[in-house]
Amino acid sequence: NDNVEPTVTSASDQTTTFIQTISPTAIEISKTYDLYASVLLAQAILESSSGQSDLSKAPNYNLFGIKGEYKGKSVQMPTLEDDGKGNMTQIQAPFRAYPNYSASLYDYAELVSSQKYASVWKSNTSSYKDATAALTGLYATDTAYASKLNQIIETYSLDAYDK
């Protein structure tokens, strides 16, 4: 099968540096918003390619691929959308543009603090794996989303940030 995506099995220096950059804010947010820092970090790594995607770099700083506007600012980017029948089509869509990583992290936390995401909150789960399972189909349509996040958490020992 040529369509199998590679899994992260060994840590990269680029990702380790990215974690060091955003982890202080992620820890602060996780305590304030009842979230797992490990899941927040893993999602940022996965969604932004460790801060290397065009959307996550300056001047956009969008770490989570959140569409729409942030304080009136957005950037048009190509994205693949599923038509509901499994057919992927590339479209141009507006994505939120942030002044920095911190704003992106806090905006994401605000998004998942809505009741829709209650199944992701630390107080409603027994482990980060419950939270990653809840995000699958809720935040992302990718059926392998939880396993991808769990693999990142394990590879980089991100659960240490949940203590």
Mark where each language-model region is.
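Catalytic cores of secreted/periplasmic lytic hydrolases that degrade extracellular macromolecules
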Residues: 1-163
